Amino acid sequence: PMTTLRTRSWDNPDDVQTPDKTHAASIKLGAVTLTKANAQPGWKWSECIKPHVGTESCQAGHIGVLLQGKIHVVSDDGSEVTINAGEAYRLAPGHDAWVVGDEPAVNLEFSTDSKEFAAWTRGES
């Protein structure tokens, strides 16, 4: 029988993506994928990720928690939010985002098999 208790180490992720100023490692736990991303100072979605995905803004949704640093997000509709370390967040598709200040931003995001929730994927629904 399959065990109901399971752990995984970030030392052995299922996937690693390293676009400009970014290191993102993903671990699958059943139907849920956890992605731990480290964005360096100077990281901005529209400069570091946009060239790889070809959309005007990030078209992925995100649910996660910022573990370290600070990120500013501007939605396509003009609304803005700053995410601080320790805060959980949900971002709808259609936004740009960047690291604020000189500290790397480290976040942990959650997704399911039914939808992509990552800045480094196309995020198509």
Regions found by a protein language model. Give the residues of each.
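A short, N-terminal "cap"/entry segment at the start of jelly-roll beta-barrel domains
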Residues: 1-40, 46-47, 122-125
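Short, acidic/polar N-cap/turn motifs at the starts of alpha helices
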Residues: 22-24, 34, 61, 70, ...
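Short beta-strand segments
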Residues: 35, 79-81, 106
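Conserved GNAT-family N-acetyltransferase fold
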Residues: 37-39, 64, 89
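Short beta-strand segments in beta-sandwich/barrel cores
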Residues: 44-45, 69-74, 97
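Glycine- and acidic-residue-biased ligand/ion/polar-headgroup-sensing regions
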Residues: 51-77
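Short acidic-glycine-tyrosine-enriched beta hairpin
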Residues: 75-94
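Ligand-binding loop in jelly-roll beta-barrel domains
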Residues: 92-117
